[in-house]
Amino acid sequence: MSILEIKGLSHRYDERDLFVNSDLTVNNGEHIGVVGLNGAGKSTFINILAGKLLQDEGEVKRLPGLRIGYLDQHATLPKDETVMAYLRDAFSYLDELNLKLEEIYNKMGEADGDELDRLIEKSAKMQQRLDDSGYYDLDSQIKKVANGLGVNKFGYDAIIGTLSGGERAKLMLSKLLLEEHDLTLLDEPTNFLDIEHVEWLVKYLTSYKKTFLVISHDVAFLNRVATTIVSIENGQIRKFSGNYDKYLEQREMLNKQYEAAYDRQQAEIKKMQDYIAKNGARASTAGMANSRKKMLDRIEVMAKPTVERDCSFSFPYLELNTKDMLVVKNLKVG
């Protein structure tokens, strides 16, 4: 089932086309990796999906009621709040439900007859929802996710304002996962994560029942968590089935097909141009040359295939006559 559709998406940034008349469908339960060169527009694309940025042209249709979560590592956090209070806020809707349930229980003491029956039925449904959500064991649910990302290392009683940038990133990711949105948008989620926490995140995402899109430069990570790849390249958004390695195989095949089609078109264009140049001035062939000219004008010329170049670097260095290459004291990472 489709939960989000993009039609005719076009957007420019800094006088450059990022997307041109692109279409895309996101289906329920898809695990999508978003790839492209730096500056291709990956983060812009995610921001448009999240509704944080308005596209220049085109339509983004979201399923009514779709809950979208976005990992914004530049978001401002409540500095005076504790880590646990911040994480607990992921379940604020359950706290509100519990308050409403208590209000109903209070009303029951003064109700009777049909009104009492109605309140009993309503409270039973609300109680069942709280039970099914594990409301009375939320701390355990919270720590299961947060511990997996290393939040326990800086403590649940810690004040957010005292945390480092890496610690805040882990905290925001933890809350986002706890909220379990219908569509989760992740921009470089492995930043600041240790290897053990990346491993935990891989296991979590591969078993995730809902939909997510993730931007990452970590190829090994993408290969393990993505079952679909969305590529942003040359102003086009294209969707490929499979992980990153499968995408590379399909992309290479499509690029070869495109290059062959481009070469055929260029050969045909040159052939027509040569004919027009040779026959345009002759009275006997000018009509046919003019006809070829009209055909040439109607051709939609294919864009020249881009050529990717590999870069290599070599940095000169001096050998140091010392045993201590690096000395660190009281280092704090993440």
Predicted regions and their residues:
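Intracellular alpha-helical coupling/juxtamembrane segments of multi-pass membrane proteins
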Residues: Q250-Y275, N279-P305
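ABC ATP-binding cassette signature C-motif
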Residues: M1-Y262, R309, F315-G334
